[in-house]
Amino acid sequence: MTKILSLFNNEYDLAKAIQKGNRKAQNRLYEKYASKMLAVCSRYVSDKMEAEDVMIDGFMRIFDKIDQFGFQGSFEGWVRKIMVNEALMFVRSKKMINVDLEAAIEEPNSFEFSSDIEAEELLKMIDSLPTGYKMVFNLFAIEGFSHQEIAEKLGISEGTSKSQLSRARAFLQEKLKQNEFSNKRIHHS
């Protein structure tokens, strides 16, 4: 097995081998990125089984579209982008995006996390966001998309994207305050 792994010294060698239809390279891609990409899919699709299905569909799309990878930029970034798009298509197909169409343009609040909060706790808070808020928050804060790109991907206006992000941040800040308050009560008891 180590011989197989050493054949693909970097992500570009791996991509080239996949473009040539090399099954071992496809396996290697899956082994290398499955857990990361499942985490990406899970940010958009809460149900674990559905997130796994989305991830598998994403890998199938990668294998179908591998010739479109132009060796400019990160291969992992290209893979991640496909996974995000696959998750968004799944959510759209299930009509799970319930976006507030009021499109009130609000400037994002300054968003500060308590240094005491654990990453796992924060991920749970993000997962508890209403679907529309969660989608925009993940795309903007985690994936790094612009409001224009988010608007195009979700079929909403830029103003709605900004509003959803602002509301997601306010929601998370409120959860953080509640968390800090309950932690202080525990420490003072």
Annotate the PLM regions:
Residues 19-20, 46, 56-74, 93-94:
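Sigma70-family region 2
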